[in-house]
Design a protein with these regions (language model features):
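A conserved acidic beta->alpha catalytic loop
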Residues: 346-354
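N-proximal low-complexity "stem/linker" segments adjacent to membrane-targeting elements
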Residues: 298-333
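Short, acidic, metal-binding catalytic loop of nucleotide-sugar glycosyltransferases
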Residues: 332-340
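Acceptor/aglycone-binding surface of glycosyltransferases and processive sugar-polymer synthases
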Residues: 365, 369-386, 403-486, 513-532
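Conserved N-terminal segment of class I S-adenosyl-L-methionine
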Residues: 1-165, 175-179, 242-243, 255, ...
Length: 562
């Protein structure tokens, strides 16, 4: 077994997942993209914190680069038609976000995706270490391909699209690669990542026979961890779908024959009987396409808040959707002496939320697509942390919670008495008098009683959206792995309490009116069921310690220097 080392992604502890059959570093031929023979890899270790599967046997840095430079894949172009169809499908997904401009393909191989992109009007550049593949791209296809690793590549013009397709798993520093590629994006540009998912159902069912376990794969990132790393770079995820590959039907049959022992013989017969022209496009749901946008903050021409010069910086985060009517009143209530910055996250509203917010002094990040209440929090918290906030307060843009209470919300944190503060409508229990429907009041009470038992707490409610966090606490929990839906609120509670954080409640009034509370009964029922699911996972994790949401954060949300 290989000597255990710290995880390359989060520095967590590694444990053996798959025993390898090869105790020696592979030769260059083992790195060919078309080679997917199982059982030729070294020991595969999985991080107990972020779940990344890594192969410590492989060399790193320049030594790894040299192996790729010497690598030849003479079989690659035998499936050129299918590979071009696969590239076309990927470009369809990219084109739905960015329809033109400069495109960089990192690890472009023989240049098939670049050639397809050029035919669609993109201005293309490729990076490829393999001398033979890069030569084919330049001399046969006439493409601009440079033989340089991504960490050494710089371009002052920037790119509208950066593609990392079937590349991230080959790199010994995937975090550095994501950071470098994000830095190459122009404002509004997208990073498209395609990589196998070791946390997928197919990967777990296939076990050691999974196609992702091959000699060339240095780091295999679970879907949730990859999303976390992208969001921690300030990127906004807009697409997360299974990858569709196109190959000849014969190749599909022969590939399955290698992995499905009991039915190998009939599959091999089928592979031999199929005509060469037959092709098939399939998604096995064990490889993802994730597209993330660089969305810059739109700054208000006349900011409502300015840096106060206080020892601690307080940032307000306002998730918003169709909040044109309520923003003016919310802004009017914000005490300007209590915070340094207010950032509204517009979840692709259909009204004038963004323009109204800017006109009233709020900075704005606008999602390219509607993603959900939890997604708005993730975007806002991540941006505030990257900008150096010390305390972050969520203030709803719909006016449901009183912005005038921001000083009371942040005081326990600034005084060192709390890591998280929640504004509770139940401490004085005037919720019904404030307009809360009785069925919501009853559901709140029942769920809170169950949660107190599961969490071992005695809080008056868990279902308030008025919350304040210390930056230190938020950076210590993997909230970027949480749901984009309403259950985000309960997942982050589980994460906070699993850390043993200090939670203080502050009484707040209840405000219910049409714009402030649009959650209907079916949505509330779904939320309740999801909350019970969170509690179940929390209780089980205390015994087994396997829930990724309660593990160490992988994304670095430290303040970025200008």
């Amino acid at each position: 077994m290989a000597t255990q080392t710290a995880c390359r992604v989060c520095a967590g502890e590694l444990s053996l997942r798959v025993v390898g059959s090869n105790g020696h570093a592979p030769l260059a031929e083992a790195f060919a993209p078309s080679l997917h023979e199982t059982g030729r890899h070294g020991d595969l270790l999985a991080c107990v914190e972020c779940g990344t599967v890594q192969q410590p046997l492989l060399p790193a840095g320049d030594e790894l680069h040299e192996l790729y430079r010497d690598m030849r894949d003479d079989a690659y172009l035998g499936e050129e038609a299918g590979r071009r169809a696969t590239a076309a499908h990927l470009l369809d997904l990219i084109g739905a976000q960015v329809g033109g401009g400069r495109l960089l393909d990192v690890g472009c191989g023989h240049g098939l995706l670049l050639d397809e992109a050029r035919s669609r009007g993109y201005e293309t550049v490729g990076l490829e270490l393999s001398r033979s593949a890069a030569r084919h791209a330049r001399e046969t296809l006439g493409l601009d391909v440079r033989e340089a690793p991504v960490e050494d590549f710089a371009d002052d013009e920037g790119f509208d699209v950066v593609v990392l397709a079937d590349v991230l798993e080959h790199l010994d520093d995937p975090v550095g690669a994501v950071q470098g590629c994000a830095g190459l994006l122009r404002p509004g540009g997208v990073l498209c990542v395609v990589t196998p998912d070791p946390s997928s159902v197919i990967a777990r069912l296939a076990g050691r026979r999974w196609w992702g376990f091959v000699p060339a794969h240095a780091c295999l990132l679970p879907r949730a961890t990859l999303r976390e790393l992208l969001a921690a770079r300030g990127l906004v995820i807009s697409t997360d779908v299974p990858f569709v590959r196109s190959f000849s039907a014969r190749r599909w049959a022969s590939g399955l024959a290698e992995r499905l022992g009991p039915v190998r013989a009939p599959l091999e017969w089928l592979a031999g009987a199929l005509p060469d022209s037959a092709s098939l496009s399939l998604a096995l749901y064990d490889e993802r396409v994730i597209i993330a946008h660089r969305i810059d903050v739109q700054h208000a021409p006349q900011p409502l808040l300015r840096h106060r010069g206080a020892a601690a910086t307080v940032a307000l985060v306002l998730p918003a959707y169709n909040a044109t009517r309520t923003i003016p009143d919310v802004v009017a209530e914000i005490p300007v002496e209590a915070a340094d910055r207010a950032l509204l996250v517009d979840d692709d509203s259909h009204d004038d939320t963004t323009s109204v917010a800017l006109a009233h002094g709020l900075d704005v990040i606008r999602h390219p697509h509607n993603r959900g209440y939890g997604a708005g929090q993730k975007t806002g918290y991540a941006r505030a942390l990257l900008d150096g906030a010390d305390v972050i307060v969520m203030v709803h843009a719909d006016g449901q919670y009183a912005p005038g209470l921001v000083p009371e919300m942040v005081a326990p944190i600034l005084e060192g008495r709390a890591d998280m503060v929640i504004g509770s409508r139940m401490l004085r229990d005037r919720a019904i008098a404030g307009g809360m429907p009785r069925w919501k009041w009853l559901g709140n009470r029942m769920l809170t009683a169950i949660e107190n038992r599961a969490f071992g707490m005695a809080l008056s409610e868990y279902h308030t959206g008025y919350r304040a966090f210390s930056a230190q606490l938020l950076r210590s929990i993997p909230f970027l792995r949480n749901s984009d839906d309403f259950v985000f609120d309960q997942q982050i509670f589980a994460q906070v309490l699993a850390r043993g954080a200090r939670v203080v409640e502050v009484p707040i009034p209840t405000r219910y009116f049409r714009e402030a509370s649009s959650v209907d009964l079916p949505t509330s029922i779904r939320y309740g069921v999801q909350t019970l699911g969170v509690l179940g996972r929390f209780v089980i994790d205390r015994r087994r310690g396997r829930w990724p949401l309660l593990r160490r954060a992988a994304g670095d949300l430290g303040a970025q220097r200008p």
